[in-house]
Design a protein with these regions (language model features):
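Catalytic core of pol beta-like nucleotidyltransferases
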Residues: 1-131, 139-309
Length: 309
């Protein structure tokens, strides 16, 4: 079985990576280094002590030890992987040991099949802290939409889709988008993929199911010729994979065939029939011209917003 987006892998050196793209064949997996063994680390699991590494530190760490892993993201040779952690496989075990995880798991299970639910992030590898957020994975767009609707409508004492203002402010600072706070919140609130469980934040993350994996278009991952930055206005024609990575928006535009977002900030930003305004890098490939948002980690000067909200 191939790795999927949001799986984790552990290498022979006990380095823990998050998988950031679907396995499209080849000898390596596109990942990002998250945790490394450290005798003085503040994260502890059955594997020992670890510390979490930030974006820049992850590149420095690999540059010094495995420079061959470095590309646009971190490419881990499949032969160096000793363990693959799958969100759906690990969730029942994690839920049995954690009350908050179990509560959200049981809540979601009342609306979608249990085998379509997983957990990723620090909980997946057992390195969560007491204040860690919960990152749940939902497989398949139909199930993802059902889970979002359930969370958005939840108003009980434990699980709720209503976030306090302080949490919205924290999310805005974390994302640091090229949008005003008011515009950011207007887009985020209707996505319905965020909630809290007894005061702890959780979110729902989409991953393709088996049938949707058959529709994976490798051309969306091709590196095209960069033409320059541009701002466009266009109607969204298709958005089935708007919550995927990359988020895909087919648009009605005389030159641009689709808008791709490689930053999660602009996933699920618009629906079919809406008019969007987007700024990013125009890329030309052998089969299309597209606008790419998220060409850098910070995505400065790049954004997507719906003009229909």
């Amino acid at each position: 079985m191939r790795a999927r987006l949001r799986d984790f892998v552990i290498t022979e050196q006990d380095w823990i990576f998050a998988v950031v793209a679907y396995d499209r064949g080849g000898e390596g997996l596109e990942c990002f280094l998250r945790y490394v063994p450290d005798a003085h680390g503040d994260r502890v699991s059955a594997r020992g002590r670890y510390r979490k590494v930030g974006f820049e530190e992850a590149y420095e760490f690999l540059r010094a030890r495995r420079p061959e892993y470095l590309d646009t993201v971190h490419t881990v040779p499949k032969g160096a992987i000793k363990e693959l952690l799958r969100p759906a496989t690990q969730l029942p075990r994690i839920a049995a040991r954690n009350e908050k995880v179990r509560a959200v798991y049981e809540f979601l299970s009342r609306h979608i099949p249990q085998d379509r639910i997983g957990i990723t992030g620090s909980y997946l590898c057992g390195l969560h802290a007491p204040d860690s957020d919960l990152d749940f994975v939902i497989y398949g767009r139909e199930q993802f939409d059902a889970a979002r609707a359930a969370v958005a409508g939840a108003r009980n004492a434990a699980v709720t889709g209503e976030l306090p203002e302080a949490l919205w402010q924290r999310l805005y600072r974390k994302r640091n988008p090229e949008l005003s706070y008011e515009v950011f919140i207007a887009h985020e609130k209707r996505k319905g993929h965020r909630g809290t469980i007894s005061g702890t934040y959780f979110d729902l993350l989409y991953v393709r199911d088996d049938a949707e994996l058959q529709l994976l278009d490798r051309r969306n991952y091709e590196k095209g010729e960069r033409v320059g930055y541009r701002t466009i206005t266009a109607e969204v024609l298709e958005a089935s994979f708007a919550f995927d990575s990359p988020a895909i928006y087919a648009v009605d535009h005389p030159e641009i065939a689709k808008v791709l977002s490689f930053t999660h900030t602009y996933a699920g930003q618009a629906v079919v029939g809406e008019t969007i305004k987007a700024r990013g890098m125009v890329e030309r490939t052998s089969h299309e011209t597209r606008l790419v948002v998220g060409t850098t980690r910070e995505a400065r000067g790049e954004w997507i917003r719906s003009l229909s909200l």
